[in-house]
């Protein structure tokens, strides 16, 4: 049975609220359609991967938010003890018990908040927090589990033996929970970035007694060497930073970067906890490779107020305006939108939220600088959705090699991805919660913004070369579309072009030699700039 519900997120609405995106140029619209398969398992905080149109989810929890006071704050019967394969097209699903595997693999597969990466046909699951081998105590695991998705898929369908498709090794590198892992390619080879996290031994309690906890305060870089039989890693490179990497339960996402040597970077967003308060970090940082092949992490100039904990993140790049847009769906947030007062308020209890925000990274059109902003979308989830839910990209949406969506390709509505599962709380703070099997389709449409030339003086428009023979390069300040019209000496418009301002555009000159006026007009027709050009 499929439960359907449809609602849209239009990126511009005039809502007079601080932090809302009412003054932003409209770059896209988002539409969400709920397509929940009611028979699917409810799950949160799982390691997830997509392969051959099927989704695989391992680990995590089948209950809601963990308890705050002992005993049994992470009960074993709420640990996910199954391996799930889901088909979003048909609603079919298959589940197998982890106990079909050796205990050395089955036990860490019951853990929650493990880091994971998907490389080729393999899902690699690192660490996590859960009950140990004899179910007597709570521990952090030091395991790397390799899951052969290409082999596991037919075994799940045919009820064949699944054990050949799981392998495991132990190493202190993986001794963590709450870390985030991503992959960037160096010289064509995947390099794993394992960022932040902590080790936690003993039963969790909010009063801070009876357990040992240590933040890792580092980022470790290594390659996984896997020929399908032997599993190993290269010697890790460890980067220490007691500010940047002192966080857990956050989000890390790939972006397109003009400043990085290989054209891509990672952004680590918010997370918890600050040294002197049980509050999220209101900052984020960028990780990239320099021209000398060294890796750097740099704080982003932005106050990250919304969607502070792990939640689904969808990343799009607008190559025309040179902007990354990172959509953060729900979760847990220190700042929330108050519908009664139509304003953003701070809640130091850090509640579950229905808010959806967009973090935008803006590349300068004229130099190597970048800027970050974060805004709330003017439409919210109907419920408190998103905490520890999974995001799956749609396989057919055009993407860059690092998985970032090519935003301008969505000139008509395209299915961009899915949101699945997560925690389903009844109220924002201190209330009961369960895991959910809610499933959303995310539809994306690119809508190019309209430029305004009202502040663009004629001297700010740059044209080269002039005189010109075949082509010219035109740079118009601002953002959005502008109309270029070639007008000859008798006042006839002989050629028109539509280009985007804020970036250089190369256009052909008219075929006939002569003197022309290039008339540059914003799409509202409110402002014009004239430039005289000699074509020979």
Enumerate the predicted regions with their spans.
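Residue-level signature of beta-propeller blades and closely related beta-rich strand-turn architectures
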Residues: 61-63, 129-131, 198-200, 272, ...
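Beta-propeller and closely related beta-sheet repeat lectin domains
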Residues: 44-47, 110-116, 177-182, 248-253, ...
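C-terminal outer-membrane/trafficking sorting elements
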Residues: 455-464, 468-536
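Beta-propeller blade signature
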Residues: 72-91, 137-155, 207-228, 280-294, ...
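Loop/turn-rich, solvent-exposed surfaces of beta-rich toroidal or solenoidal domains
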Residues: 306-404
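Asp-box/WD-like beta-propeller blade repeats and closely related beta-sheet repeat scaffolds
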Residues: 109-113, 131-185
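Blade-edge beta-strand/turn elements of extracellular beta-propeller
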Residues: 23-36, 91-104, 150-172, 224-243, ...
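Beta-propeller domains
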Residues: 23-36, 47-100, 132-140, 148-157, ...
């Amino acid at each position: 049975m499929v439960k359907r519900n449809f609602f849209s997120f239009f990126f511009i609405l005039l809502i007079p609220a601080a932090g809302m995106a009412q003054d932003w140029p409209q770059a896209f619209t988002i539409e969400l359609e709920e397509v929940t398969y009611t028979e699917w398992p409810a799950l949160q905080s799982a390691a997830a991967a997509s392969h051959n149109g099927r989704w695989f989810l391992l680990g995590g929890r089948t209950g809601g938010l963990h308890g705050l006071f002992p005993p049994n704050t992470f009960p074993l019967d709420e640990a996910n003890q199954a391996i799930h394969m889901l088909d979003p097209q048909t609603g079919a699903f298959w589940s197998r018990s982890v106990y079909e595997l050796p205990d050395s693999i089955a036990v860490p597969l019951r853990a929650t908040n493990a880091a994971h990466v998907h490389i080729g046909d393999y899902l690699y699951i690192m660490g996590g927090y859960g009950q140990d081998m004899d179910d007597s105590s709570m521990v952090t695991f030091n395991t790397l589990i390799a899951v052969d998705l290409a082999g596991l898929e037919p075994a799940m369908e045919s009820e064949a033996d699944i054990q050949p498709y799981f392998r495991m090794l132990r190493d202190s590198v993986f001794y963590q929970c709450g870390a985030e892992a991503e992959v960037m390619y160096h010289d064509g080879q995947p390099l794993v970035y394992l960022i932040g996290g902590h080790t936690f031994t003993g039963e969790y309690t909010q009063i801070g007694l009876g357990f040992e906890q240590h933040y890792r305060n580092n980022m470790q870089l290594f390659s996984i060497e896997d020929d399908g039989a032997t599993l190993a890693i290269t010697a890790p490179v460890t980067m220490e930073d007691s500010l940047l990497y002192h966080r857990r339960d956050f989000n890390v996402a790939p972006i397109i970067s003009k400043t990085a040597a290989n054209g891509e970077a990672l952004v680590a967003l918010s997370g918890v906890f600050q040294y002197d308060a049980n509050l999220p970090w209101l900052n984020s940082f960028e990780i990239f490779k320099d021209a000398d092949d060294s890796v750097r992490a740099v704080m982003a100039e932005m106050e990250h107020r919304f969607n502070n904990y792990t939640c689904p993140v969808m990343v799009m790049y607008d190559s025309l305006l040179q902007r990354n847009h990172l959509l953060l769906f729900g979760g847990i947030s220190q700042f929330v939108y108050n519908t009664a007062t139509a304003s953003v308020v701070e809640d130091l209890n850090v509640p579950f939220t229905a808010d959806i925000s967009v973090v935008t990274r803006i590349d300068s059109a004229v130099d190597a600088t970048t800027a970050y902003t974060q805004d709330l979308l003017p439409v919210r989830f109907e419920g408190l959705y998103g905490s520890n839910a999974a995001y799956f990209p749609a396989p057919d949406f055009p993407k860059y090699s690092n998985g970032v969506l090519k935003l301008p390709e969505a000139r008509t509505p395209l299915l961009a991805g899915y949101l699945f599962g997560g925690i389903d709380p009844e109220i924002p703070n201190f209330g009961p919660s369960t895991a959910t099997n809610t499933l959303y389709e995310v539809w994306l449409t690119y809508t190019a913004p309209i430029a305004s030339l009202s502040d663009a003086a004629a001297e700010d428009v740059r044209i080269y070369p002039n005189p010109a023979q075949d082509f010219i390069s035109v740079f118009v300040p601002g953002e959005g579309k502008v109309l270029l019209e070639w007008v000859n000496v008798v006042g006839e418009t002989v050629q028109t072009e539509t280009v985007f301002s804020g970036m250089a555009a190369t256009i052909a000159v008219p075929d006939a030699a002569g003197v022309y006026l290039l008339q540059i007009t914003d799409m509202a027709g409110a402002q014009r700039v004239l430039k005289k050009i000699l074509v020979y």
